[in-house]
Amino acid sequence: MKSRAALLWGIGEEWKVDEIDIDGPGPGEVVVKTKVAGMCHSDEHVVTGDMLMPHYPCIGGHEGAGEIVEVGANVTSVQPGDHVSMSFIPSCGRCKWCVSGKSILCDLGAKLFDVGMMTDGRMAHHHGSTDLARMCQLGTFADYLLVSEDAVVKVEPDLPWHAVALVSCGVSTGYGSAVHRAEVEPGDTVVVVGIGGIGINAVQGARIAGAKRVIAIDPVEFKREKAMEFGATHTFSSMEEAAGPLAEITWGEMANKVILTPGVMKGEMIQPALDITAKGGTCVVTAVASMLEGEASLNSFMFAMMNKEIKGCLFGSGNPRADIPALLSMYREGLLKLDELVTRTYTLEEINQGYQDMRDGKNIRGVITFD
């Protein structure tokens, strides 16, 4: 099968759109015609080298939605014509983590950065004689995807494609950071640091969970304004600027929950985040740091004495097969904002402009639409 795809040939290079060849589906595999792909910051981490790929060139993209057009042998959960949301977190339903309700940690996740197919390890994507890797075993920046059945979640066919795409990564991750990992409760004061595609959804997750105050922190005024539309009650440009007013409005208690969702996580952000976290409070680290980032500084004495905790968070600590349908149901009922997340749509050929707009702070979420 022929397909267009956005390829990254090395660290620091631009995406190049070219024609590729995709093999037919093997057992347990499906072919998906992409309808919408989300432009997540994690793909930018691959460009900058903060997230190292095991092989170049690679097909970018891990957030998206599409229609099943072909299935391989032994596929039982979907059939041609089904609409699906892509899941960069696979869910086999058989490993220890899946059967104990923690499919976010499915053992298949160890294969996310493998070069070959998740199913049998073969190379199935090619540019001429050159084999191609794929971002998170997906590669949604392409007209067609060949993926494991375990990496798609069937959804209702009348839902708009952009909504189905957005819940496959950014929305689930941000919402879950507040609801599942931070465990925001009614009456809480919540701080979200970094208002991009993930942070904005942590804001609305905290609002939906009943937070009394939601403080959004971002240096970009446009993003602070958008945060107010999604449920923020206060905004500031930095944690340092927020500290004084936060102490005043909480009578010195500070934030019950702090969620870190900046574009790039840095170790030096931990202590300022703990400084605005209340006694017994929780600091959730969702943002991706460079794989080479080896240190985080904190006052370990005060950390222990104030009984605070730091939690890592992947995909909002949720369950893709449960969360994706649940979030789409909330969207259908008007409880979750998805349409308002899309700042601008692009063609595949405009992918580099889309990522430049993201770097310039112009987008909450850009999406690529396909014919």
Please identify what each model-predicted range represents.
Residues 22-37, 50-99, 104, 112, ...:
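Glycine-rich beta-strand-centered segment in the early N-terminal region that forms part
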Residues 4, 16, 21, 33, ...:
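Residues located in well-ordered beta-strands
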Residues 263-335, 370-371:
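Glycine-rich phosphate-binding loop and adjacent beta-alpha segment
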Residues 143-144, 150-152, 156-244:
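Mid-domain Rossmann-like dinucleotide-binding core that forms the NAD(H)/NADP(H) cofactor-binding site
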Residues 88-150:
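Cysteine-cluster motifs in flexible loop/terminal segments that predominantly coordinate metals
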Residues 1, 240-241, 257, 271-275, ...:
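C-terminal hydrophobic helical "lid"/dimerization subdomain
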Residues 242-252:
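Short amphipathic alpha-helix with an adjacent loop that forms part of the alpha/beta core around
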